[in-house]
């Protein structure tokens, strides 16, 4: 049945056509022009470097001090030692000396902690070995 339907249809050129010569009002022409297109710079813009920006140059400070009441030092950013009096770790340490163990002879986790650590390590090693075995030719 499909072949009879397809054979009864004949593909004819459509009577609907677009006349490329006539232009429609209000629409731009789609034809390409043969004129070449060039880009030219308008001129060279010089950067002024005689007076630098920042605290040493372009920043206007009221009464000669910044918002924290300090006079400018000529640097654009604060230095941690000058601003805080110490390195950042002096005020926000990542460790606390009171939490340290008095000696390193005894593990703080005890026997249970060591057993959990050993089982985790053995599981990771066994899992890795199983992955290597399953992806190798030995598993075939």
Swiss-Prot record:
GO process annotations (BP): photosynthesis
Q: Which domain of life is it from?
A: Eukaryota
Q: Which GO terms describe its cellular component?
A: chloroplast thylakoid membrane; photosystem II oxygen evolving complex
- Does the record bear Chloroplast in its keywords? yes
The UniProt record lists the keyword Chloroplast: yes
Return the InterPro entries for the record.
Answer: PSII_PsbR
Subcellular localization is given as: Plastid, Chloroplast thylakoid membrane
Transit peptide: which residues?
1-41
As for family, the record states: Belongs to the psbR family.
Task: Give a short account of what the protein does.
Answer: Associated with the oxygen-evolving complex of photosystem II.
Q: What is this protein called?
A: Photosystem II 10 kDa polypeptide, chloroplastic
């Amino acid at each position: 049945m499909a072949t009879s339907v397809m054979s009864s249809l004949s593909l004819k050129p459509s009577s609907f056509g677009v006349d490329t010569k006539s232009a429609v009002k209000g629409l731009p022409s789609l034809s390409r022009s043969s004129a070449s297109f060039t880009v030219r710079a308008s001129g060279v813009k010089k950067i002024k470097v005689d007076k630098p920006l920042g605290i040493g140059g372009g920043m206007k400070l009221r009464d000669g001090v910044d918002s924290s009441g300090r006079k400018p030092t000529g640097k654009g950013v604060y230095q941690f030692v000058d601003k805080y009096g110490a390195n950042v770790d002096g005020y926000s340490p990542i460790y606390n000396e009171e939490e340290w163990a008095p000696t390193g002879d005894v593990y703080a986790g005890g026997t249970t902690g060591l057993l959990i650590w050993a089982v985790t390590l053995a599981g990771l090693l066994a899992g890795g070995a199983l992955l290597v075995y399953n992806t190798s030719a030995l598993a075939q």
